[in-house]
Curated annotation (Swiss-Prot):
Zn(2+) 2 binds at C165, C168, C187, C190. It is found in: Cytoplasm. It comes from Helicobacter hepaticus (strain ATCC 51449 / 3B1). Belongs to the DnaJ family. One of its GO terms (biological process) is chaperone cofactor-dependent protein refolding. The lineage of its organism: Bacteria, Pseudomonadati, Campylobacterota, Epsilonproteobacteria, Campylobacterales. This is Chaperone protein DnaJ.
Amino acid sequence: METFDYYEILEITRTSDKETIKKAYRKMALKYHPDRNPDDKDAEEQFKRVNEAYEVLSDDSKRQIYDKYGKEGLQNSGFSGFSGRDFSDIFGDLGSIFESAFGANFGFSTQKRGGGKYNLDEIVGLELSFTEAVFGCKKEIHNSFKIACSDCKGTGAKGGKLNTCKDCGGKGQVYMRQGFMTFAQTCPTCKGEGQSASEKCSKCKGSGFEISEESFEVSIPEGIDDGNRIRIGGRGNADKNGSRGDLYIAVSVAEDENFVRDGENVYIEVPVFFTSIVLGTTLKIPSLRGELELKIPPNTRDKEQFVFDNEGIKDVNSAYRGKFVAQIKITYPPKLNAEQRALTEKLQESFGIESEPYKNVFEECFTKVKQWLHKHSKNDKDTTK
């Protein structure tokens, strides 16, 4: 993985929120997009970097690992940089940009399922604790959903009487010209229905729906992650015939105080005192399912990672279980008392020249510098003769 900083690529700070990250991504993606920079290899490479940066910083778990452990942590979690999506996938991420510039019918719009005044599919949010998401649970869902107004039968018009929209002639779309091109837009008067009410329904105030409520229990699968959605068929809004769409539960998972999640992998930072690093030690560390024994060999490096296979989180769609990764953080005493200082000095003296490794390096460097100066001084003297 190349050594460039994701925040610098998007020209943002490390404290930037998601909205700022998204705006920066759109700006930089448009700037370096291949369609705007044909045959420009540098722009193409920068475009890949922009997407790689956004792929990490827009994902809470990846961003948390990147901020805490750097790219090495991401590599150990299986992230290998730009995912290699083709540019049609990228256009999907940038759809809202093109829609605002060219209108909703440029190929990125979504159609309202059901053809009525409201969408039959509905989305609700559900917050889970870290433990609930990792091990699964059951949750009571309180759902408010739309049903067609009993007075106007879902039309929003008094007595259900609708007239053909005068602005679009019943087509639901109006057309506009930009230069030599013509674009279609949803009719702002009838909102794409092709019909409009001369007088609003007094019961639903023209909305075409009433609100009904229900409660039911949902089984949350083991391993579900933040940002995942659960589809519940037949629990969405109802059309005028009583047929219901689907309910999508958007899952939000709280962060844990000790564990950091990235997909099916889990990270924990293990503080180890410097003397234990020098001597080596064995520790009991907390894991998702109890304790693990961590053997730390002498002279382990700071931020070195120890991987426990099959101790992570179960994949929500398979039997695969991720890794549990323990990362070492070497700690030092903030200050020494007189006795500790004397012991430390005595220990350093006992190592002799080994305790001053810089001397050999510097002496070799000094020798090279002196030789270089002597050589050039001699050449200068020969030149002046």
